[in-house]
């Protein structure tokens, strides 16, 4: 405000990610032009998305939330590791918090790049949702039923019993099979229907899931399996 003049800048509510802009003001006294500028930063909502959606974003300051399975750890103490979900894999670079291989984690960070490859930058470990144990299909079938213990299974889909709820049989290279009663991609369990069909998952595809061991009519099975990896047959 100067000599009775006032400039008012109003920003609309930000329902997206963080955003920044620069407002340039120009005035004149009739002889000389004066310019000033003001940088404005507005925090936004943290945007939840899949790994594939994150990888497709541009480098910037928007904060994203991803949930994935830790598939490789370069340096746990330094927060350098890979996470994957059913859509793909991404590198997490120097995130706060410490993780272990086969943890299911939720990460918040920005889309950064290194030599053109997307990665999670300025990351923060929001939550270790669960820790799972990798196991062979044979050992899984022989394991005791336990609703509190999580396993990581990998196998090729050999039969889709129900594509609406994701009831499938998977098989390993030794011919061992496991029945999965329900496969979906949402760790929260809110979206359990049509995961198989919506994502074009078919017989012959290899999937990696995190699941508990249960039984039905004395037959072993995995239940409520969350998919953290898909390798297409073709």
Regions found by a protein language model. Name each.
Residues 12, 24-30, 110-112, 212-214:
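Beta-strand-rich extracellular modules
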Residues 12-14, 201:
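Hydrophobic loop/turn residues within beta-sheet-rich immunoglobulin-like superfamily modules
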Residues 20, 35-37, 215:
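Death-fold interaction domains
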């Amino acid at each position: 405000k100067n000599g009775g003049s006032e400039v008012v800048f109003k920003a609309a509510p930000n329902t997206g990610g963080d955003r920044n802009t620069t407002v340039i003001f120009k005035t004149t006294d009739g002889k000389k032009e004066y310019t000033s500028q003001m940088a404005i930063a507005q925090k936004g909502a943290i945007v939840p998305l899949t790994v594939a959606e994150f990888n497709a974003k541009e480098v910037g300051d928007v904060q994203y939330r991803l949930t994935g399975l830790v598939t490789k750890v370069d340096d746990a103490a330094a927060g350098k590791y890979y996470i994957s979900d059913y859509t793909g894999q991404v590198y997490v670079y120097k995130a706060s918090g410490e993780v272990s291989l086969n943890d299911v984690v939720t990460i918040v960070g920005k889309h950064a790049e290194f030599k053109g490859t997307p990665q999670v930058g300025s990351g923060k470990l929001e939550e270790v949702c669960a820790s799972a144990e990798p196991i062979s299909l044979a050992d899984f079938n022989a394991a005791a039923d336990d609703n509190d213990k999580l396993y990581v299974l990998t196998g090729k889909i050999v039969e889709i019993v129900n594509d609406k709820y994701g009831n499938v049989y998977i098989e390993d290279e030794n011919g061992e099979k496991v029945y999965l009663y329900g496969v979906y991609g949402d760790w929260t369990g809110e979206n359990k229907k049509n995961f198989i069909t919506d994502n074009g998952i078919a017989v012959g595809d290899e999937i990696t899931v995190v699941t508990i061991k249960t039984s039905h009519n004395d037959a072993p099975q995995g239940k409520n399996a969350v998919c953290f990896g898909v390798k297409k047959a073709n």
